[in-house]
């Protein structure tokens, strides 16, 4: 009965949004709809002491992922100008992040550790994918190619990786409780992407429209930074590179 009611609510809300909201706002409005629905049920669950109701929160990530993949597919294959920060997208995604991690925190002593571990990994990977979707949009919009594009993708890969390197040794949730996930699984696509970036960057000269200085130009400095980051990840035992 709970699942039937939840599915009915989602379908009714989706139809209302499709009927009354402009197409360019569908992505952000649907995320807000999913997020507020989960947040409201979580509050109701605590109010009436019905823990099973709060487990509807496990739907938030899959729903948002399906929505994002659908919109990304439309942007990629149909040519619609859709990207995460469009309209109220950033505020909607901020609400999603807050509710998602609040839900995972509240479930830490209720649900199985394996299930929560998987959701931490998948949530982080989903957030990474949104960053790369956003970056690919602005790369096309600003027509950045060659060295400019290489620096853009360097930043997209390095910033979250450096954040993980600085946070995984903190004794705070969720990094302390799920240290294996945040050191092994979550950074894996970042490190793989950075390795591929380094290989691709070796084929660029580093010359830009600005003043060019051999060795001390942005691309060469970025490549040096990658080597330092890889050395530090080995030292910190990320994805068990120190074994």
Segments predicted by a language model, with ranges:
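Alpha-helical transmembrane segments of multi-pass membrane proteins
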Residues: 1-243
């Amino acid at each position: 009965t709970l699942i039937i009611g939840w599915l009915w609510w989602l379908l009714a809300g989706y139809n209302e949004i499709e009927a009354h909201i402009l197409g360019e706002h569908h992505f952000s409005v649907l995320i807000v709809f999913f997020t507020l629905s989960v947040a409201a049920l979580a509050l109701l669950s605590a109010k009436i002491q019905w823990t099973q109701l709060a487990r509807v929160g496990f739907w938030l990530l899959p729903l948002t992922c399906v929505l994002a993949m659908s919109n990304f597919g439309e942007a990629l294959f149909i040519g619609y100008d859709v990207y995460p920060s469009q309209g109220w997208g950033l505020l909607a995604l901020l609400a999603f992040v807050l509710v998602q991690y609040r839900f995972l925190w509240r479930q830490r002593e209720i649900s199985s550790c394996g299930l929560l571990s998987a959701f931490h990994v998948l949530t982080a990977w989903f957030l990474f994918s949104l960053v790369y979707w956003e970056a690919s949009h602005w790369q096309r919009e600003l027509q950045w190619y060659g060295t400019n594009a290489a620096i853009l993708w360097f930043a997209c890969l390095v910033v979250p990786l450096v954040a993980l390197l600085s946070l995984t040794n903190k004794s705070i949730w969720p990094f302390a409780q799920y240290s294996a996930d945040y050191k092994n699984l979550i950074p894996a696509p970042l490190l793989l992407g950075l390795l591929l970036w380094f290989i691709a960057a070796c084929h660029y000269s580093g010359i830009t429209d600005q003043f060019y200085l051999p060795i001390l130009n942005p691309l060469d400095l970025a490549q040096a930074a990658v080597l330092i980051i890889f050395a530090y990840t080995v030292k910190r035992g990320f994805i068990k590179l120190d074994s």
